[in-house]
A protein has these predicted regions:
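Short, intrinsically disordered low-complexity segments
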Residues: 18-95, 99-101, 105-106, 111, ...
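Compositionally biased, intrinsically disordered low-complexity regions enriched in proline and serine
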Residues: 13, 23, 48, 147-150, ...
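Short, extreme N-terminal segment that most often corresponds to the first beta-strand
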Residues: 1-25, 166-169
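Long, compositionally biased intrinsically disordered terminal regions
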Residues: 102, 106-169
Length: 169
């Protein structure tokens, strides 16, 4: 999913008019755009697919291509834009994140399998959210950037589409 101010998400709506943006919490200053296959397909139809990224010697490619990265760079001009991804099943899985600021990649795509057991503040999603201005509200797992931003209330992109507040960009 993409995370950023409305201005950074607006270019995606120009490519895919059906793209939907949501606020996860009341008074949010950052918003999310769940990346569906339709959005990826439209972006890749307009600009080419590019290469799928494989990060950190992993055997798993990210749901991110070189085309996605170039477009995110352009979309972040004048603001910041993050890309975050989680893939968990039965409590185990991976998370990934990247950030662009003012058109430049400021946090390269990072993938972390749970087996690496890095402290929560150093995991890619929390690091990306922190770079976007989200501050953890306390200590412990339930008060990290992920929880503060409101992601803990949703188990999937489908939950966000069903339950979060849709906003106009």
């Amino acid at each position: 999913m993409l995370v950023g101010p409305k201005a950074a998400l607006r270019p995606y709506g120009a490519i895919v008019p059906a793209a939907r943006v949501f606020a996860l919490t009341p008074g949010a200053f950052l918003f999310v755009l769940p990346l569906s296959d339709d959005i990826h397909d439209a972006l890749h139809a307009a600009y080419g697919t590019g290469e799928w990224l494989i990060v950190g010697g992993s055997d798993r490619s990210l749901r991110l291509t070189t085309t996605d990265m170039a477009f995110a760079g352009r979309a972040s001009a004048g603001s910041a834009l993050g890309w975050i991804e989680t893939d968990y099943s039965g409590g185990a899985g991976t998370q990934a994140g990247a950030v662009w600021t003012g058109g430049e990649l400021t946090m390269r795509p990072s993938l972390l399998p749970d087996r690496e057991n890095r402290p929560w503040p150093l995991r890619p999603v929390n690091a990306a959210l922190r770079m976007l201005g989200v501050s953890a509200t306390g200590t412990g797992l339930q008060s990290d950037e992920f929880a503060t931003f409101g992601l803990g209330h949703y188990r999937s992109n489908e939950d966000i589409v069903r339950e979060a507040l849709e906003v106009r960009v």
